[in-house]
């Protein structure tokens, strides 16, 4: 589910407290009151449906189809990657992370950032979006394995990264 600018919103069936314009704020407040941190898991990029609908990029004169780069996760093709050479792609991330900050998000895991290709420009874009959000957030990158050749860049731009592939049972 997204808003009119293509920003991700919680599913109100799974998270009833997110109804209306609440977003994750009521849930984050509840979790914070228990002394815990609140985090979300995002797939890299912009939802394909947002691009198909060609929604406006918040705070810009761009449209969604101008900022996608047609890369997608091999295992989940719901999002397109972002063309970080277009400043409107950064504006999209900035808007998404300002929304997350307004809800009180403390931790963000961004999936599909390293395999099969390390997405250096997008990693830098996520870091910058957090810096501009007005709220400190832990940035965790996934999936692994992130090549150790990229270790210095990852360490300079994220707090954590996964170094192995998903573990699946095979009973």
Residue spans for each PLM region:
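Aromatic-lined carbohydrate-binding/catalytic grooves of carbohydrate-active enzymes
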Residues: 1-29, 33-112, 116
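Extracytoplasmic, non-cytosolic globular domains
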Residues: 96-145
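Glycan-recognition surfaces
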Residues: 66-71, 83-91, 95, 135-171
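Short low-complexity, flexible loop/linker segments enriched in glycine and/or proline
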Residues: 53-57, 122-126, 154
């Amino acid at each position: 589910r997204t808003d009119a600018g293509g920003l991700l919103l919680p599913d109100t069936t799974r998270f009833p407290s997110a109804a209306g314009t609440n977003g994750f704020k009521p849930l984050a407040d509840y979790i914070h009151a228990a002394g815990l941190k609140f985090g979300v898991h995002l797939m890299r990029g912009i939802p394909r449906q947002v691009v198909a609908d060609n929604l406006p990029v918040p705070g810009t004169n761009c449209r969604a189809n101008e900022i996608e780069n047609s890369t997608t996760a091999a295992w989940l093709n719901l999002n397109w990657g972002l063309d970080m050479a277009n400043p409107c792609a950064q504006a999209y991330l900035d808007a998404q992370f300002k929304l997350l900050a307004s809800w009180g998000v403390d931790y963000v895991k961004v999936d599909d950032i390293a395999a099969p290709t390390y997405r250096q420009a997008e990693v830098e874009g996520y870091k910058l979006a957090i810096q501009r959000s007005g709220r400190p957030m832990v940035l965790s990158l996934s999936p692994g394995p992130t090549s150790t050749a990229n270790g210095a860049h990852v360490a300079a731009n994220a707090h954590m990264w996964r170094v192995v592939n998903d573990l699946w049972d095979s009973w």
